[in-house]
């Protein structure tokens, strides 16, 4: 894995007796899109707020770009959108970013580059209050892009958007990663994370349950076989792949984690005298994996 730009070790946040974030150990590699996945109230936003120095951890440590959260060296290298964008409704999109750029000592080129990259250059002089929700979210990302930071931390950037707005935001995030930004993206939208993220951390009730690539999290693909009669086909399949790999389900025979066995399985079923109705690769969705992991939480 590439060098880590975000590292936490035992990161914990307590509010009285309530533990909002519990011993989280995460790694975000430079250049990747990292999906921080969990249901509402899982501890995602609290974790992000600790990473940017907005709140102090109760225990544990975090480093961002090699420094403690909130350090001046970190502030210059990260762009943040947490809990929705906040702008002056009576100012234009351009003027809102101009206020932020001036505060940070940035010039006109930075401002115009940010507007262009989020696709708002042609609407930049419209008042913020006239923007659609999707445009407001994109302006928020534009604000995070001021100064071309190495790391973007985006908290639920598609929350509340319609399907078109969600698609546009996914395209934008993918393009930003292609331009060399690392993106730490929190979301409860499983399909969104599966589609654009390189690696995923799954959090539930404050605990980080898993951290891996999307492919690793979903696991090896399986085969699904339907045949008649099943009482003939099932023993034939087990004879090829073994008892543990073949599972009889309501939808057919699921063959887990045995690559390259499809031809042999098909022959065995037919030779046993059963009619082979269907044999296809069946991959678990991230949604299925997520619910399996969090159902006991």
What positions do the PLM features span?
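Short low-complexity, flexible loop/linker segments enriched in glycine and/or proline
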Residues: 201, 292-295
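Non-catalytic alpha-helical coupling and interface elements of nucleotide-dependent molecular machines
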Residues: 102-105, 242, 295-296
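ABC transporter nucleotide-binding domains
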Residues: 2-8, 13-204, 208-210
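Short, charged/small-residue-rich alpha-helical element at the C-terminal edge
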Residues: 222-293
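Generic structural signal for individual residues within well-ordered alpha-helical segments
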Residues: 75, 97-98, 112, 167, ...
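Conserved beta-strand-loop-alpha-helix hinge in the C-terminal portion
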Residues: 207-228
């Amino acid at each position: 894995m590439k060098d880590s730009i975000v590292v936490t070790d035992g990161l914990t946040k307590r509010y009285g007796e309530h533990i909002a974030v519990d011993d989280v150990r995460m790694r975000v590699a430079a250049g990747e899109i990292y999906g921080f996945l969990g249901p509402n109230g899982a501890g995602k936003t609290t974790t992000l707020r600790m990473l940017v120095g907005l709140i102090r951890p109760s225990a544990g440590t975090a480093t961002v770009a090699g420094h403690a959260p909130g350090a001046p060296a970190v502030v210059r290298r990260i762009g943040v959108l947490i809990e929705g964008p906040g702008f002056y409704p009576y100012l234009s999109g351009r003027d809102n970013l101009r206020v932020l750029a001036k505060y940070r000592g940035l010039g006109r080129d930075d401002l115009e580059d940010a507007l262009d990259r989020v696709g708002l250059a042609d609407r930049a002089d419209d008042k913020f209050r006239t923007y659609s929700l999707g445009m407001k979210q994109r302006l928020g990302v534009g604000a995070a892009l001021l100064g071309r930071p190495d790391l973007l931390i985006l908290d639920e950037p598609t929350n509340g958007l319609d399907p078109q707005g969600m698609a546009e935001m996914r395209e934008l995030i993918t393009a930003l990663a292609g331009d060399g930004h690392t993106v730490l993206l929190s979301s409860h939208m499983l399909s969104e994370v599966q589609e654009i993220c390189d690696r995923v951390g799954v959090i539930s009730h404050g605990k980080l349950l898993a951290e891996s690539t999307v492919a690793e999290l979903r696991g090896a693909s399986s085969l699904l076989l339907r045949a008649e009669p099943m009482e003939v086909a099932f023993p034939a399949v087990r004879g090829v792949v073994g008892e543990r790999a073949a599972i009889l389900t309501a939808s057919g025979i699921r063959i887990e984690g045995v690559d390259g066995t499809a031809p042999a399985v098909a022959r065995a079923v037919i030779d046993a005298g059963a009619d082979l109705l269907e044999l296809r690769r069946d991959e678990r969705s991230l949604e299925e994996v997520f619910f399996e992991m969090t159902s006991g939480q």
